Each structure stands twice: as structure tokens, then as C-alpha cells.
Amino acid sequence: VVVMEQGRIKQAGPAREVYAHPRDRYVAEFMGGQNVLSGRVAKVNGGSFLLKQGAREAIEVPLQARRGIGVGDTIDIAVRRDDVALVRPGASLPPGCGTALPSRVTAIEYQGYFVKVMLDTVPDDEFVAYVPEKTFFADPFNVGDVVLATWVADRARPLA
């Protein structure tokens, strides 16, 4: 797969690699299936950094192959929609999950093997969780419900 913008190659590689590891916001949004969050780096901790979005709780993001990130930098991160878990406030987070962004359910679409849950996590932008069908219907959410959007820390990827 080759993703181009205005006649220039942004990223090329096997489809699975480009989809799962987009290099930048353009590729992530073009390929779809990603939530992109923007913020400022609040702290760098060896193998990870903390991304701050306004008054929200900081998000821990592994540095992975990305180097040269410093405190105060503005950066985008991507989290695949199928890596986002939704839990009710007060419930325990799934193992390995640390970030928990309060959100309100704005729409629900049944897609067959998963349920697409749209959230107001990011003002004026789309944030979506693909919840497995059986998981969703075991304890379904309704439009207007408050939930916590969470994911395992190493599933967040810094973008260029």
C-alpha cells in the first residue's frame, strides 16, 4: 500500500503495517480505524512520555521507535478503535490499562461482529470504540451514558 498526499509518498509498506503503524496524522486518518489525540508532552520517563490534553488526565505513551520528544512538544498519538475498551465509572479498568478518559456515548451502530460506539472524548473530533458484539451486549451502553475510554498503554502510538 502506498499513501500519497498531493503527489508525495507519505508512507509505503504492507497493508497491515501501514494500517497498524501509521507514521503521521494524515496516514492514520486516511487509512481509518484510528483515534488521533493531540496534546503537549508534560514529562518524559525513559521509555515513555506523558501527553497532556487541557484539563484531562495525562496519557502515558510509549516512545517506541520515536526519539527526540521533549517536554512542551505538541504531538499527535494514535489509538486503534479496536484497542479501546469502555468501562462504566467506578468499575475496575482492564489489566494493563492506565489511561481512562471520561466520555459520553453520542451514537451506537451495530456492525455485526462489533458495535461502533461514538464518544465525545475529543471536542469537535471523532473518537470511536469498536466493541466486540458479545462484550457490548453483555452490558450494553445507551446514548447519553458516561463511560471511561481506556486502552493498554503500549497500544498508543506517537505519530510524526
Residue ranges, per PLM feature:
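Internal alpha/beta loop-helix hairpins
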Residues: 1-57
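Non-catalytic connector elements of ABC transporters
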Residues: 34, 43-160
